[in-house]
């Protein structure tokens, strides 16, 4: 029995399902989850000492690679001053200034401790600001596990085969309208049906929780126009895409300006940080300047602020954005070429530093229903064939993969060499 198997058996006695987030349990791909002991650069090492080239990157935050010296140094310098104060610090101002510089649509920003907290707070703010209750989200998109948003959600909910599940009151769900991603007509219909009741529309600009699905050319700008027409707050959820699709986020990449933006993952550099921000007139509607309440004991935590500031400062250096995108392109197109070589129905999609692998005859995947028609069983087999060769992909056919600046050309070629063997066995 491997050390990971021993640890998983032990974990299940004290932790529900043996994990602290469902996708980690490998329910989507089968087998025993890999327990990680340490990580460095593009590599993770499991409890048995086996190394893997990592394309999960803690589900996105590790854009510089694991254990980056700039982040570690910043954290070690901050720790001796105290771990948490529950009071304002200069570091939270500095990080906020950098965020507003990198993402111009954000005029004011509030720090929180997770992406879920960011989206939950943004939804509450939009409802308070507009005086309306209903929200629009998209089938297959995931915005965290708050009640209002766990309605036909993607991510772990899909991995478990529960697009919506128990524990979410019907009274919450009735206010959430679910439209089809990349289909403006479905959004128009929702607005026409409830023209004066919709507080906001929230969207993943690149849907990364039903794998990796970019928006069609007119989709995001069409959403912006509909929100303007009906007086709804337009929220772009950049928890995953922020600073990864482009330094200014997917909104910069696709040239669209939201009213509110939610952030997470990269903004913390590996520490638990989320944020939401946007137009001053909306953000000032939140406490203490406005009536909408939001608070957090660990919001703006000084250690997390130090890590986030170091991460964004390093990522902002010239050439990094382009390098990340180029490496991702090489990997994704390499996967596709190898699948074609072995006559495996397959397509790869990518934007900036994120990518998706689909086992399908379709040349392009554009929405949730098309994702559900892909061959998840074949992905599961591919996942394990890659894992055996020391390549760690997302353990779910519904999750995007992530490139980091630590991945070298040699790492990518080693990954593709492993993929060549894996595709040959499918």
Curated annotation (Swiss-Prot):
InterPro entries: 4pyrrol_synth_GluAld_NH2Trfase (IPR004639), Aminotrans_3 (IPR005814), Aminotrans_3_PPA_site (IPR049704), PyrdxlP-dep_Trfase (IPR015424), PyrdxlP-dep_Trfase_major (IPR015421), PyrdxlP-dep_Trfase_small (IPR015422). The modification N6-(pyridoxal phosphate)lysine is found at residue 265. GO terms for biological process: protoporphyrinogen IX biosynthetic process. One of its GO terms (molecular function) is glutamate-1-semialdehyde 2,1-aminomutase activity. It is found in: Cytoplasm. Homodimer. Belongs to the class-III pyridoxal-phosphate-dependent aminotransferase family. HemL subfamily. This is Glutamate-1-semialdehyde 2,1-aminomutase. It comes from Actinobacillus pleuropneumoniae serotype 3 (strain JL03).
């Amino acid at each position: 029995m491997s050390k990971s198997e021993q640890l998983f058996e032990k974990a299940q006695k004290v932790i529900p399902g043996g994990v602290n987030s469902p996708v980690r349990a490998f329910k989507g791909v089968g087998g025993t989850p890999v327990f990680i002991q340490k990580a460095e650069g593009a590599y993770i090492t499991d409890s048995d000492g086996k190394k893997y080239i990592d394309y999960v990157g803690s589900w996105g935050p590790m854009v510089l690679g694991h254990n980056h010296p700039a982040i570690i140094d910043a954290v070690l310098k901050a720790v001796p001053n105290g771990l948490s104060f529950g009071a304002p610090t200069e570091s939270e101002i500095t990080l906020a200034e950098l965020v507003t510089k990198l993402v111009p649509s954000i005029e004011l920003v509030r720090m929180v401790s997770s992406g879920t907290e960011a989206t939950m707070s943004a939804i509450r703010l939009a409802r308070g600001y507009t005086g309306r209750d209903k929200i629009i989200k998209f089938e297959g998109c995931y915005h965290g596990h708050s009640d209002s948003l766990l309605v036909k959600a993607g991510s772990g909910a899909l991995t478990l085969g529960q697009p919506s599940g128990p524990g979410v009151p019907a009274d919450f769900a009735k206010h959430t309208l679910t439209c089809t991603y990349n289909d403006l007509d479905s959004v128009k219909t929702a607005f026409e049906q409830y023209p004066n009741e919709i507080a906001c529309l929230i969207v993943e600009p690149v849907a990364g929780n039903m794998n990796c699905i970019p928006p069609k050319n007119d989709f995001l700008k069409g959403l912006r126009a509909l929100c303007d027409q009906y007086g709804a707050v337009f929220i772009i959820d950049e928890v995953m895409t922020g600073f990864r699709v482009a330094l200014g986020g997917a909104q910069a990449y696709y040239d669209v300006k939201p009213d509110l933006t939610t952030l997470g993952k990269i903004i913390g550099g590996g520490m638990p940080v989320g944020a939401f921000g946007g137009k001053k007139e909306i953000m000032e509607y939140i406490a203490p300047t406005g009536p909408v309440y939001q608070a957090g004991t660990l919001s703006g935590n000084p250690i997390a602020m130090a890590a986030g500031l170091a991460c964004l400062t390093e990522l902002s250096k010239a050439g990094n954005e382009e390098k990340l995108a180029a490496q991702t392109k090489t990997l994704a197109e390499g996967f596709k070429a190898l699948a074609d070589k072995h006559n495996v129905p397959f397509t790869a999609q990518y934007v900036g530093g994120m990518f998706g692998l689909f086992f399908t005859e379709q040349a392009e995947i554009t929405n949730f229903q098309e994702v559900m028609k892909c061959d998840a069983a074949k992905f599961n087999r591919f996942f394990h064939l890659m894992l055996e060769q020391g390549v760690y992909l997302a353990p779910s056919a519904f999750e995007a993969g992530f490139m980091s600046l630590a991945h070298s050309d040699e790492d990518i070629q080693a990954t593709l060499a492993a993929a060549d063997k894996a595709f040959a066995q499918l």
